[in-house]
Amino acid sequence: MLKIILCALNEAQNLQTLIPNLSNEIKSLGADFKIIICIDGSNDESFSLLTDLQKNHPLEILPLKNEIGLGLAYKRLFTEIVNNSADDDLAISFDCDNTHNPEQIAKMLNYFHKNSLDFLVASRFCNKSVIEDFPIHRKFITKTTSLILQNLFAVKRISGEKLQDYTSGYRIYRVKKLKELFAIQKNNFITEPEFTYTCELLIKLARINSRLDEIPISYDYGKKNGKSKLRILRNFWRLMILLLKLQVRL
């Protein structure tokens, strides 16, 4: 089964079209699936909208009364996945802001299965990736983050090349490997409360010999609706602290 996991903070205007599009795309693949979405303390119409969408789509809602941050919201989602999924299930993480294209899931799944992967990143920075309308300041921070992580940790793809994109949220995970990490780390498998959880989880999965890779993605930031929730400077400093913690545990 495919478990599509999303975290939403005041994303009602996007969810109204995203959930049907995502659901219809997975249905076209003939796969058994469920969409699980964590509402991270939203104060818009997200909950009522999703409740209505449940009538026509396999949708599970995990509402949080107060905002706890992207990382901890995904920790809630991954805990749900680990506790209530079969080993051969796959989890696909997906952003709610319209920048991820559901039509690329088929290509990602094909590559994942063909190469017997445990973890796949939809990459914005590897060869043949396409990024449109990505703000210069965000591209600089994101690319700089990945370069720092490449030099410190050098996570390797199945080809032996260094992984290029450490922060993309568009990913496929093998649930069996998530359970293995959870058994080792227990409640500490994700400790970062915000965006930097993407780096933390990737590095921890690499350290338990996950078979991982990345695949080019078409990423159109111009399709994004609503104000960005990403606090760039705060997350950059959180990343520096995370790097120190991970280095100590090498």
What are these regions, as identified by a protein language model?
Residues 39-48, 98:
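A conserved acidic beta->alpha catalytic loop
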Residues 85-99:
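Short beta-strand-to-loop acidic/aromatic patch adjacent to the donor-nucleotide binding site
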Residues 13-17, 44-48, 72:
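Residue-level preference for short helical/loop micro-motifs built around acidic side chains
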Residues 62-80, 90, 102-191, 222-230, ...:
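Acceptor/aglycone-binding surface of glycosyltransferases and processive sugar-polymer synthases
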Residues 26-31, 54-59, 85:
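Short helix-capping segments at alpha-helix termini
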Residues 4, 35-37, 61, 91, ...:
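Hydrophobic/aromatic residues located in beta-strands of well-ordered beta-sheets
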Residues 1-6, 13-24, 28, 107-110, ...:
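Hydrophobic helical membrane-anchoring modules
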Residues 31-42, 64:
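Short beta-strand/loop segment that forms part of the nucleotide-sugar
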